[in-house]
Amino acid sequence: MKKITLALSIPIIILASEYKIPPKAIADIVDAPLTPTMSLSPNKIDYLILSRSSLPSIEELSAPELRLAGVRINPAMNARSRRTSYTEAKLHQIGQSRSIPLKGLPNNAKIHSFSWSPDGKSIALAVSSNAEIHLYIANVKTGKSKMLLRSPLNLTYGAPFVWRSDSQSLIVKSVLERRGIAPKRGMKPSGPTTQENLGKIAPARTYQDLLQSSYDEALFDFYFTSQIIDISIKGKKKLIGKPGIVKRIDPSPDGNYTMIQIIHKPYSYIVPVSYTHLTLPTSRSV
C-alpha cells in the first residue's frame, strides 16, 4: 500500500511594521527623567545642573560602531560610542532659587563633556547637534555660549580639552583637517600577524575589542590621531607639535610648559590602548 504525503504550502508574509507604543502609564515610567547631575564650580558659589534622557534613542543604538584597541567608538562622531550625554544644562548659585539656562547652543544639542575654568568664570563644553562635536565656551554669569573652535573635537580617547591655569586658554584635541576618507577593508596587509610564546608558563588576562590586523591598525591611526591646539577664550589659536595619538595632556601650574603623553607604534594586539607604551614630550608655551 502506497502512502501519499501531501505537502501544504503555507505562505509566509513578512511585513515592515513600526515600533509599538506601550500604554501611557508604562511609557511614563520608562521615560521618566533620571536624577540630574550636579557640578560645583571651583569658587564653590556657582553650580551646574545637567539633565539627561533615561534611555538612549534608537538612533544612538543603531549608530555605527568600531571596536579598536579595547575602545568602542562611533566613527561618524569621532567619539566613544553610547557614552553619557546631557540634553539640558542650567546654572545656579548657592542660596539663590533663580536658574540661568545655557543660551547659544544649537537646537537639540547634546553635551558630551564639560570642564570649569580654574577661576570658575567659564565652562568649556563638547557639544554636538549632528555628526560632529564642537568646542563651546559658556559665560557663567550670563549663561551665553559660543562656538570657540570650528574644527571638530576628537573624543575617541582621553579628555578632549584641558584648561590652562590662567583660565584664559585651553589645550584641545582636534580631528585632523583634510584627513581624507577612512581606510577600506580590502587593503593589502603589510605582513602576517605573529605571536611569540617564550618564557615560563603563566596565566594571562584576556581583553575584548583588541586590534587584530593591519586594517585595524589603520583605522586606529585614522580615528584616534589628534592635532593639539592651544586656543584662547577669545578664539586665537596655534598648533602644538605634530599630530599623534594623545593619551593625556598636562599643563604646568605656571602655564609655561605642557606635558603631552603620545602613543607610538608598534601597537599591541594583546592589551588595550590604556596599557600601551608612550613617550612624554614636553613643549614650552610661548
What is the role of each PLM region?
Residues 1-4:
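Positively charged n-region of N-terminal signal peptides that target proteins for export
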